[in-house]
Amino acid sequence: NYLLAIRALRFAANFDIPIEPNTWLAIVRSSTRVLDYVPAADIMDEWRKVAAESMYRFVKLMFDAHILQGLIPEVAALACIRQRRNDDDDTEETVFDHTLECMRHYPEEGFHYDWLGTMAMLFHDVGKLFTGEYFDGQWTFYQHHRVGAGVTRKILRRLHFTSEDIDLICHLVRHHMMFHFMLTDRGIRRF
C-alpha cells in the first residue's frame, strides 16, 4: 500500500518527528510507484489531514522524497529559480525556499491558522516559473501573480479541489501583490 508513504510523511510533519532512516529510504525508493499506484484524490485526502501550521514541513518532506516533483512539478521546479532575498542586500534564495518560509510564517502569531490560506501560500509564486527573466544581472518576475493564478487553477483541478476552494485560492494568489501596489501615494489615494 503505497499510500502509507504519504501517511508517514503526514505523521512526521504533523507531530514534528523524524522518520526512521530505513523507512525514509523505502519512501524515497518507492516514490515513483506512489504516483503510479495512488490516485491524486487519495493523496489529497491525506494532505487535507495535515495541520496548516505543519504544511511547510509536509511539502518539504514530499520534495525531499521526490514525490512533489511528480505530483506538482510546477512547485518543485521553483527550487531551480533564484531570487534576491530582499532589496537591501545581495543574498539570494530559491523561490521554493522562499515559498516554504512564507508557509511557515503564515499567518503570523495571533491569527487563526487557515488551511486554504496556507495552500495559497504554496502557490503564491508559482507564476515565477513562467515569467522569470534574467536581465542586467538580476531576475525579474513581472505579472507573476496573474500568470500564477491561472497555473494554480489548472493544478488544483488536477488535484480534485472543489470549485469554491479553487476560486478562493486563485483569488488569494492573484491578489497577493495588492498591498505592494497600494503602498504608493497613488495607490493609497485610490484605496
Indicate where each model-derived feature is located.
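Short, intrinsically disordered, charge-balanced linker/junction segments flanking boundaries
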Residues: I188-F191
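Glycine- and charge-enriched loop/helix tracts that form the active or gating conduit
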Residues: Y2-Q143, V147-I166, R174-F179
